[in-house]
């Protein structure tokens, strides 16, 4: 009943494993979306060299930076919305 007083409820080992697996899936999905999006934007389909040139490297660096900035902003916004919903739910008792 610690969750009634602000503490997190105890999780069993199975729940912890399931939560960790979900987190790994989310991170893998984010990495795949990042790779696909930035590669599509920054690397041409006709490869001319074996290595990235300076323009491609700079483009990828900026793309990854923007991707993480947006990801952080969206996460913060969603946490704020979730907090408001939890706060509002407690007041309606």
From Swiss-Prot:
A motif (Twin CX3C motif) lies at residues 38-63. It holds the Pfam family zf-Tim10_DDP. The keyword Membrane applies. Disulfide bonds join 38-63, 42-59. InterPro entries: Tim10-like (IPR004217), Tim10-like_dom_sf (IPR035427). It is found in: Mitochondrion inner membrane. GO terms for cellular component: mitochondrial inner membrane; mitochondrial intermembrane space protein transporter complex; TIM22 mitochondrial import inner membrane insertion complex. Keywords: Chaperone, Disulfide bond, Membrane, Metal-binding, Mitochondrion, Mitochondrion inner membrane, Protein transport, Translocation, Transport, Zinc. Gene3D superfamilies: Mitochondrial import inner membrane translocase subunit tim13 like domains. GO terms for molecular function: metal ion binding; protein transporter activity; unfolded protein binding. Heterohexamer; composed of 3 copies of TIM9 and 3 copies of TIM10, named soluble 70 kDa complex. Associates directly with the TIM22 complex, whose core is composed of TIM22 and TIM54. Interacts with the transmembrane regions of multi-pass transmembrane proteins in transit. Mitochondrial intermembrane chaperone that participates in the import and insertion of multi-pass transmembrane proteins into the mitochondrial inner membrane. Also required for the transfer of beta-barrel precursors from the TOM complex to the sorting and assembly machinery (SAM complex) of the outer membrane. Acts as a chaperone-like protein that protects the hydrophobic precursors from aggregation and guide them through the mitochondrial intermembrane space. This is Mitochondrial import inner membrane translocase subunit tim10. The lineage of its organism: Eukaryota, Fungi, Dikarya, Ascomycota, Pezizomycotina.
């Amino acid at each position: 009943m610690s969750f009634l007083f602000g503490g997190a409820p105890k999780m069993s080992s199975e729940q912890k494993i399931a939560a960790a697996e979900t987190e790994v899936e989310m991170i893998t999905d984010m990495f795949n979306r990042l790779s696909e999006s930035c590669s599509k934007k920054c690397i041409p389909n006709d490869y001319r060299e074996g290595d990235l040139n300076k323009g491609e490297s700079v483009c990828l660096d900026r793309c990854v930076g923007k991707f993480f900035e947006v990801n952080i902003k969206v996460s913060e916004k969603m946490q704020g919305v979730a907090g408001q919903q939890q706060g509002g739910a407690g007041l309606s008792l």
